[in-house]
Amino acid sequence: SLSVVLTIVYVAFILYETLMFRESGDARTNFVLFSYAERFLTEQSVRVGVINNIWLFVPLGAGLYRIIQKKWVLLVPFLMSVAIETTQYITGLGIAEFDDVFGNTMGGWIGVLTAWAWLSRKMSVKNRT
């Protein structure tokens, strides 16, 4: 179906964005969750980074909601983000960060909830007519 194709294309886009624009170097990590919290209000670059981590996974969550079993839909964004951060760590591409996993997972969940709300409303309107 179109939902499957679009979701696969979007997964490829995420992988491209998170892995292909990085220079290989020494593996760097930041395993402190919410390490940017103090600087979030004062540094625009930190805000942009956090927001980008969230919005990047919103379409993924929405697509997944339509194509996989509902019991897995909240787990997949988390697992994909962990896989990306692990790849970044192993290859030295970028910085492997817990904050990225958290933001990506939240974005995926926002996408799932948005798709659920939109499709529930659509079905409700359809049933009324």
Regions found by a protein language model. Give the residues of each.
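Bulky hydrophobic segments
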Residues: S1-F98, W109-T129
